[in-house]
Amino acid sequence: MRIFWQSFVDEEASAPYLARLSAYLSGIAAPGVTVDVRGLSPSDRDFGRLAEFRCSMRAISNGIYAERDGYDGFVLGHFQDSGLYELRSALTIPVVGVGESTLFAAAQLGRRLGLVTLDPTFEILHYEQADRYGLGGRITHVKGLSFIPQDFSAAFEGDAEAKARLLRRFAECAEPMVASGADVIVPAGVLPGLLVASERAYRIGYAPVVNCASVALKSVEMWMQLRALDGIEPSRGPSFALAPERAKADFQATLAPTKPSARRQTP
C-alpha cells in the first residue's frame, strides 16, 4: 500500500528534516507500506491565515492527483490540518490529518492537553482547531516555540548540541503547562514531533509527550486496513459529501496544472 504524506515545508530549505522524516516513517511503517513524503514550494513561510489557505489549496490539488496515481491513503502532514475536510470530501481513499489524529489520541491519555507549537502565530489556530473537533474544553494550554522550520535542520543532520538546545526550549514551553495542570503534552507540529521521536517514553514531569508523526502514520494505516476489511469510509451526507468530478476539475483549473514531483519514497 502507498501513502502520500504532504508536508507544508520547502523541499530544499528543509531537506534535512524531510530526509529524516522519510527515514523515520520508513522505519516504523507496516510491512508492505510505502510512504512518499512531499513538500511545498512556496512553503508555509510567512505564518498566518493566508499562507495556511494557500498551502491548503496546493495540498488539496496534490491529494486529487495522488488518488488518481493510485495511492491508498493520504496524510495531511501539517498539524493545523488546513484543507483537511476539503480533502476528505474530494478523495475516496482514507485522509488523515496529523492534528486531528493526534489530538484524539492524546485525549485518551489525559484530560487536559498542552500544545507546544512552532510559532506563537499558530496558538489561536490551535484553539480554533480544538473547537472544530469538539475538544475545546480539553486544550488548556498552547505555547509557540518561536522557531522556523530551518531551525531544526542541524539537529536532523546529527548535531547533538543543536538537538539538546531544541529539546531544552521545548521543555521550557511545556513545563509551566504541566505545573498548572496539563497532563498530556502534544508537539503541535511534525517538526517538534520528529524531534522527540527518538526520546522513548519522553515525559515532561508526569505528562507523556505524544509523537504526532507516529500517531498519524499508524492512524492512516489503520483506516486503510479497515477500508479493505469493512469497506468503511467517511459519511457522504452533509459532513463529507463526495465532490463530483466537475467540482474537482474546476478546483484544479484554479491552480497551475503541475503534478507534484516525486522527491522521497520510503520502501
Q: Whereabouts are the PLM-identified features?
A:
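Short, structured coil segments at secondary-structure junctions
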Residues: 31, 90-93, 109, 135, ...
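Short, flexible loop segments at boundaries between secondary-structure elements
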Residues: 209-230
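Active-site rim beta-loop-alpha module in soluble metabolic enzymes
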Residues: 132-189, 197
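N-terminal glycine-rich anion-binding loop in soluble enzyme alpha/beta folds
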Residues: 1-54, 119-160, 251-252, 256-267
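A C-terminal functional module that forms or caps the active site or interfaces directly
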Residues: 183-204, 208-212
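Glycine-rich, highly charged phosphate/nucleotide-binding loops
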Residues: 48-65, 164-172
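Glycine/small-residue-rich loop that forms an oxyanion/phosphate-binding "nest" at active or ligand-binding sites
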Residues: 60-105, 109
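Short, acidic/turn-prone active-site loops that include or flank metal/cofactor-
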Residues: 98-103, 118-122, 212-217
